[in-house]
């Protein structure tokens, strides 16, 4: 049986919020079967919980924000992407502020944290959402689609009218039955343009952004001393973002996601449309792991 999994141990990290610029203490904790991923604002009294579900998304400007009344948690997508990539079903994410720390701008540090905490299988079957037919949302020339696929595959195409990105790979497709999230996607960093920074900061966005936690691009090139981690890092980061956004379904997917110039808003619209169209999906689990179209690395002992 493919089982649900959580963390073996509690683990902590410190960072800054990309948009708020605030110092943030992050604690990842094990959670019982069928809890899902739940964010906790531990700086508030009483503590406020926000489950990582599509219906709780309140803002999608530059990041995905979860809300519960007037309480919010910003920039959840990179951590959720790491949770999805490592198959974590149940965990508590405690924060000392309103934003998940940006770390290095990728999911890599979160993967390291989760692997350091160790993974623990639980005594319940892992639930998957299987896509049964095409579901699409569009906004102008932007598009996001779910398709049936016997596995999990994410295809993405970006089209930035920028001299530097014009020369880079702007499309990618990753079939996770033949390659790993950790290897292919997890280290791709978020990116931003110098031309946008003044506008963003005027609107209290990207206050914590720097070359330490993002790829920064001006009209002539990439400003980061070490350059790109891969030629397709820009589009791979959009895949990373999409995987995090899709995990707001609350379960791992069996199907294909295709995005064309899609972002957090359109990704969330697609999830809401899928959830509403109950004939487009089904919940499945696998008593025999060898029959499943998706496999996960075996849990290893915590380091």
From Swiss-Prot:
Its EC number is 3.5.1.108. It holds the Pfam family LpxC. Zn(2+) binds at residues 78, 237, 241. Keywords: Hydrolase, Lipid A biosynthesis, Lipid biosynthesis, Lipid metabolism, Metal-binding, Zinc. Its cofactor is Zn(2+). It comes from the Bacteria. It catalyses: a UDP-3-O-[(3R)-3-hydroxyacyl]-N-acetyl-alpha-D-glucosamine + H2O = a UDP-3-O-[(3R)-3-hydroxyacyl]-alpha-D-glucosamine + acetate. Catalyzes the hydrolysis of UDP-3-O-myristoyl-N-acetylglucosamine to form UDP-3-O-myristoylglucosamine and acetate, the committed step in lipid A biosynthesis. PANTHER family: UDP-3-O-ACYL-N-ACETYLGLUCOSAMINE DEACETYLASE 1, MITOCHONDRIAL-RELATED. Belongs to the LpxC family. This is UDP-3-O-acyl-N-acetylglucosamine deacetylase. It comes from Pseudomonas entomophila (strain L48).
